[in-house]
């Protein structure tokens, strides 16, 4: 995945963008066959919730049983890195430009929103997945589900 040249994205801002993208993306079942975001967001949320306690449990278990500290720390760090990997991936995905097939569909959905009387801000530059997430979220609130039939 490549990032657009007009946006400066540093390593740590990708985590914030990933968090925002996961909150913006509509978790609709009809989008799951086309976009992998549904699975990644669900697994990232699961990892954010359960991996820190698993890391603490792993450390305590190894120390209580007299195990070596090195493998326990490595296992705990791996468990703690899983949510970060998900957020990083979502952040990278959010700034990735849309491929041509999805770009056409993006403009069709925007057109349907404008036809229904919604006021939309003009698209600046090449649209990315974050713009798609914002548009889809608004479309699911404002339009009926038939706009997905063209997907």
From Swiss-Prot:
Chief site of localization: membrane
Protein name: UPF0208 membrane protein YfbV
InterPro entries associated with the record: UPF0208
Periplasmic-facing ranges: 66-68
Organism, scientific name: Escherichia coli O6:H1 (strain CFT073 / ATCC 700928 / UPEC)
An annotated GO cellular component: plasma membrane
UniProt membrane topology term: Multi-pass membrane protein
Keyword check for Cell membrane: yes
Keyword Transmembrane part of the UniProt annotation: yes
Domain of life assignment: Bacteria
NCBIfam families referenced in this protein's UniProt entry, alphabetically: PRK01816.1
Pfam families tied to this protein: DUF412 (PF04217)
Stretches of the chain found on the membrane's Cytoplasmic side: 1-45, 92-151
Localization of this protein: Cell inner membrane
Keywords in alphabetical order: Cell inner membrane, Cell membrane, Membrane, Transmembrane, Transmembrane helix
Family stated for the protein in its record: Belongs to the UPF0208 family.
HAMAP family: UPF0208
Residue intervals passing through the bilayer: 46-65, 69-91
């Amino acid at each position: 995945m490549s990032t657009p040249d007009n946006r400066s994205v540093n390593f740590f801002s990708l985590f914030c963008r990933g968090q925002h993208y996961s909150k913006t993306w509509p978790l609709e079942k009809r989008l799951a066959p086309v976009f992998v975001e549904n699975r990644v967001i669900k697994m990232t949320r699961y990892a954010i919730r359960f991996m820190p306690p698993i890391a603490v449990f792993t450390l305590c278990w190894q120390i209580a049983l007299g195990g070596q500290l090195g493998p326990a720390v490595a296992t705990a760090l791996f468990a703690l890195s899983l949510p970060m990997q998900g957020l990083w991936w979502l952040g990278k995905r959010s700034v990735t430009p849309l491929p041509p097939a999805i770009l056409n569909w993006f403009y069709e959905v925007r057109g349907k929103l404008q036809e229904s009387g919604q006021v939309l801000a003009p698209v600046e530059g090449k649209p990315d997945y974050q713009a798609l997430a914002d548009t889809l979220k608004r479309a699911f609130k404002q339009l009926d589900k038939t706009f997905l039939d063209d997907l």
